[in-house]
From Swiss-Prot:
GO molecular function: ATP binding; DNA binding; helicase activity; hydrolase activity, acting on acid anhydrides
Motif placement: DEAH box: 280-283
CDD domains: DEXDc_RapA, SF2_C_SNF
Biological role stated in the UniProt entry: Transcription regulator that activates transcription by stimulating RNA polymerase (RNAP) recycling in case of stress conditions such as supercoiled DNA or high salt concentrations. Probably acts by releasing the RNAP, when it is trapped or immobilized on tightly supercoiled DNA. Does not activate transcription on linear DNA. Probably not involved in DNA repair.
Cited HAMAP family: Helicase_RapA
PROSITE patterns: HELICASE_ATP_BIND_1 (PS51192), HELICASE_CTER (PS51194)
Family recorded in the similarity comment: Belongs to the SNF2/RAD54 helicase family. RapA subfamily.
Alphabetical UniProt keywords: Activator, ATP-binding, DNA-binding, Helicase, Hydrolase, Nucleotide-binding, Transcription, Transcription regulation
The name this protein goes by in its record: RNA polymerase-associated protein RapA
Keyword check for Mitochondrion: no
SUBUNIT field: Interacts with the RNAP. Has a higher affinity for the core RNAP than for the holoenzyme. Its ATPase activity is stimulated by binding to RNAP.
Broadest EC class assigned to this enzyme: hydrolase
Length: 969
């Protein structure tokens, strides 16, 4: 390297310093001053990591005074360059610019500039960049985008609802699946799709206070969506950053109570300009025509101002008709304006349901059914379809004709677009429940303490006394003090220890009402038998609960028993276990259902054993009988339980408080009778039509198959590992399909997106991720992959490379130039541009004559024949063929235009076809189904117009290039 004072060089390792000037030299070192960043660097002369900056004829260069020069001639004198040419601003000719006056800010951002400046990247980085571009393009175009990356089993009805609703513009929908069918996951999938497609940027979730953490965890664990819980404290903190605290976060989660109690916070939430509002447990919003509750008004206010609304609620039958109408009114007040009209309309659906039932049966259609269908579809000619169904055509043609009729009828079915509801009856795949009720002798110690408590507790209300009597161990402890070890003599504990030993290989979930009971049970198992157990209660942080859940889930060396308190277990699911022990019983059938629902969920592969040990002659024994004989609530899900409970709870409280069981048999008998009546009403009122629509039938199955085919994509694994390598993350193989990824000191950026400071355990396997909550499930949609790709693009990794091709058939020194262009439409994400024209890579492979060989030379196969070169040799090769490279880039720029035009044309065609089909369908439906909102139609019309403009203006630029030189050795 020969240096001279005043020469301009650029640092290879710190390109952001700008252009440096040689300001001092001695025999061993050279000093460069980087004026743009006000830094000096001293390098050893013989191997300084710097590259000489030289420009060629045709380049445009900037002067320190702010004007630019188009170079026409370059002279070198004593190691310094002088450039001659024309000023760009004044068009003055024969202007002289000495290199000392070059702008210090010059950065080599264009790939060709980096190549000429010797800033040559590693060959594998170039390959990684190209793969990132192509994979990202394919992901954006996929119709399953937003559904593949969630940590959840592939359950057809959930995926169907999410796919159906998630693609709509500002969906307004009621999700009313029965318990255990996964409404939260459906809502999460819809949110995830809306976020990825850019349709929703600001989201507000309103839930009952007890469910806040569950939602926070579910959104983070399953969908990598990080919500912030807002309460009064958080709002006061946020006030420092913004007038309206809700403006400080994009994804907000808060309780309904919080908005109800404070008018100020409610008004601030109203001004939050949300794109999507999600309300869980919406059946608790009470409404009547003359007097809506305050909670209802809060949600109504938010729903009026928010374009997209998801309401999650119990099934409509549990709600009753009026209450169900009130939910629909929140979604579309113009359409559901009058309760009487709604009732009348509902009654008209009976013939539609009958018609569909006869189509589904696959048998010959009776004339009556045909007349009904013809009448219902009066605006279309259905005769040809009837003919196909009755002809001797193949089964497939018949099935598709039936399906077409069904689809058309479904579309006309009033609430089909607004309401989705699945029942266990309509969905297969639930386990059987085996119930074991075990009466046990009551220890003497309890009898004494309960008798004494009965004498002193005269002033308590019946309800308080009934609650207290449910937990004899707490009464005993009150008398004996906190050190009292009731678990040394409690017969339920003795039974539990035996049970756990008997089921050595099985995971057992124990649920108790109180956190204190759960903690003491763990102590009993540990101290009396050395059994590995872990606890889960509301006093623990989310992270601690996760660790406990992961310890329980571990196959080897994990806990055999997990003991949960009532609140601690809310919203957590342990499908991998099938043994449930209820150490005590909750007072309310909904809570009982929730306990069983921890194991009895869609996705449970085995039958469930439910063990209920209870002490004879206590309140627990009374409750156990009522749940079992009155409601059959242990053996079956009990959608009617709440209604029966509301009717008989006062009588039950009296019995539990006084211990007088003389009326118990009568209450059990009446409860069972009422329960039976309510259940048969439910069965008759089952809206089969709605069920057919909600579970998606064949379509749902196809979605599952499509996603299954992308699971376990080896392409993703290879890509992710090279991405982590390039960015500088440490990777340790953990076995069991798992890797541990941690930040290193040599990372390209100080913190990696989506990766916690302490690192993370990741897996690419869906089943592993489902059984291990502490692992991240990596898919193309995961922030670690998306963020990594964004990093590659923004940091300019792999934009220029040089490779050698060893091929004796070609003369030594032959060059090829691989050019990667990217077509990009500058448009806001919410416009939906990425569906039709995401960033699209176009690859050209130029030979030395300027022909494009990309059609004959496939990327991956060709890449395997190339070998990398070091930066020094690469720089020399570039310098020797720089003029040829210039010429080939110019030829490439001309050739690529034709391909860009084809890309634009294809995007326009896809967009017009997709959106016009949807538009025509909605317009046709509008005539017969008032559930189509005008806004939906207007939104699509506006979107078509907007996208046409964006696609026409899409630009192309050179993203990266690779020079390939033929050698023989």
């Amino acid at each position: 390297m020969t240096f001279a004072l005043g020469q301009r060089w650029i640092s290879d390792t710190e390109s952001d310093l700008g252009l440096g000037t040689v300001v001092a030299m001695d025999a061993r070192t050279v000093t460069l001053m980087f004026a743009a960043s006000e830094e000096n660097r001293v390098y050893a002369r013989n191997d300084a990591p710097v590259t000489r900056v030289t420009f060629n004829v045709g380049d445009v260069i900037d002067c320190q005074e702010g004007w630019s020069l188009k170079v026409e001639e370059v002279l070198e004198d004593e190691g310094l360059y002088t450039y001659f040419g024309t000023r760009e601003d004044t068009q003055e000719t024969a202007v002289v610019l000495r290199e000392i006056f070059l702008s210090n800010q010059i950065r080599f951002n264009k790939p060709q500039d980096k190549l000429y400046a010797g800033q040559i990247d590693r060959m594998d980085n170039f390959v990684l960049r190209y793969r990132a571009l192509t994979n990202q393009f394919e992901q954006h175009k996929s119709p399953m985008r937003g559904l593949c990356g969630m940590r959840a089993g592939l359950i057809p009805h959930q995926l169907y609802i999410a796919h159906e609703v998630g693609r709509r513009h500002a969906p307004r929908v009621l999700l009313a699946d029965e318990v255990g069918l996964g409404k939260t996951i459906e809502a999460g999938m819809i949110i995830h799709q809306q976020v990825l497609s850019g349709r929703a940027e600001r989201i507000l979730i309103v839930v009952p206070e007890t469910l806040q953490h569950q939602w926070l965890v579910e959104m983070m664990r399953r969908f990598n969506l990080h919500f912030s819980i807002f309460d009064e404290e958080r709002c006061i903190e946020a006030f420092a950053d913004a007038e309206n605290p809700f403006d400080t976060q994009q994804y907000v989660l808060c309780s309904l109570d919080f908005l109800r109690k404070s008018r100020k916070r409610f008004e601030q939430a109203l001004e939050g300009e949300w794109d999507l509002l999600v309300v869980d447990e919406a059946h608790h919003l009470e409404w009547s025509q003359d007097k809506p509750s305050r909670e209802y008004q809060v949600v109504e206010g938010l729903a009026e101002r928010t374009p997209g609304v998801l309401l999650l609620t119990a099934t409509p039958e549990q709600l009753g008709r009026e209450s169900h109408f009130a939910r629909l009114r929140l979604l579309d007040p113009d359409r559901f304006y009058d309760y009487e009209a709604f009732v009348e309309e509902e009654e008209q659906y009976a013939p539609v349901a009958d018609a569909i039932t006869s189509l589904f049966s696959g048998e010959k259609l009776p004339d009556e059914a045909k007349n009904q269908i013809t009448e219902l579809l009066s605006e279309q000619d259905v005769e040809p379809l009837f003919r196909i169904i009755e002809s001797n055509s193949d089964e497939e043609a018949k099935a598709s004709a039936r399906q077409e009729l069904i689809d058309n009828l479904m579309d006309r079915h009033g609430t089909g677009r607004v309401l989705f509801r699945n029942t266990r009856a309509a969905i297969k795949g639930f386990p059987t429940r085996n119930v074991h009720l075990m009466p046990m002798d009551i220890p003497q110690q309890y009898t004494t303490s309960m008798r004494v408590a009965g004498m002193i507790g005269g002033k308590m209300s019946s309800e308080a006394r009934a609650m207290k009597n449910l937990y004899p161990e707490e009464i005993f402890q009150e008398f004996e003090g906190d050190d009292a070890s009731w678990w040394q003599f409690d017969s339920r504990v003795n039974w539990l220890l035996e049970k756990v030993k008997e089921k050595r290989g099985e995971k057992i979930l124990v649920i108790a009402s109180r956190a204190s009971t759960a903690l003491q049970l763990e102590q009993a198992l540990r101290e009396r038998e050395g059994i590995r157990a872990t606890v889960f209660h509301e006093g623990m942080s989310i992270l601690e609960r996760d660790k406990a859940a992961a310890y329980f889930a571990q196959e080897e060396g994990g806990a055999q028993v997990l003991i949960c308190s009532e609140i601690g277990s809310e919203g957590r699911n342990f499908q991998f276990a099938n043994q449930l022990v209820m150490f005590d019983l909750p007072f309310n059938p909904d809570l009982l259902e929730q306990r069983i629902g921890r194991l009895d969920r869609i996705g449970q592969n085995r039958d469930i054993d439910i063990h209920v040990p209870y002490l004879k002659g206590t309140s627990q024994a009374i409750l156990a009988r009522w749940f079992d004989e009155g409601l059959n609530a242990f053996a079956e899900t009990c959608p009617t339980g709440r209604a029966v409970y509301d009717k008989y709870s006062d009588a039950l409280i009296e019995i539990l408080a006084s211990g007088d069981t003389s009326t118990l048999d009568e209450i059990i008998e009446e409860s069972a009778k009422l329960n039976k009546e309510l259940k048969s009403q439910l069965e008759q009122g089952r809206d089969r039509l709605l069920e057919m629509h909600s579970n998606g039938g064949e379509k749902a199955q196809q979605i599952v198959e499509k996603i299954e085919s992308t699971d376990g994509d080896t392409n993703l694994v290879t890509f992710a590992l090279s991405l982590f390598d390039t960015i500088g993350l440490n990777q340790d193989d953990k076995g069991e399909n798992a890797l541990v990824v941690t930040p290193s000191e040599h990372m390209m950026v100080p913190s990696y997106p989506g990766l916690p400071y302490e690192g993370a355990t990741i897996t690419f396997d869906r089943d592993t991720a489902l059984s291990r909550e502490d692992m991240h499930f990596i898919s193309w949609e995961h922030p670690m992959i998306q963020g990594g790709i964004d990093l590659l693009m923004s940091e300019g990794v792999g934009t220029s490379a040089v490779s050698l091709l060893k091929n004796k058939a070609l003369p030594v020194g032959t060059i090829l130039l691989e050019l990667i262009y990217a077509v990009d439409a500058q448009a806001p994400k919410r416009s939906g541009i990425t569906r039709f024209l995401p960033k699209t890579p176009i690859r050209l492979m130029m030979d030395s004559r300027g022909n494009d060989l990309s059609a004959q030379v496939e990327f991956e196969g060709f890449n395997r024949q190339l070998s990398p070169v070091n930066r020094h040799l690469g720089s020399k090769l570039v310098t020797s063929v720089q003029k040829d490279v210039h010429r080939l880039i110019e030829a490439g720029d001309v050739l690529v235009e034709e391909k860009v035009e084809a890309v634009r044309k294809q995007a326009q065609q896809d967009m017009q076809q997709s959106l016009n089909t949807e538009l025509e369908r909605l317009q046709a439906l509008k005539a017969v189904n008032p559930n189509i909102r005008d806004e939906e139609i207007e939104a699509i019309e506006a979107q078509i117009k907007e996208l046409t403009g964006y696609i026409n203006q899409a630009q192309v630029q050179l993203d990266s290039l690779r020079l390939i030189v033929v050698s023989h050795n």
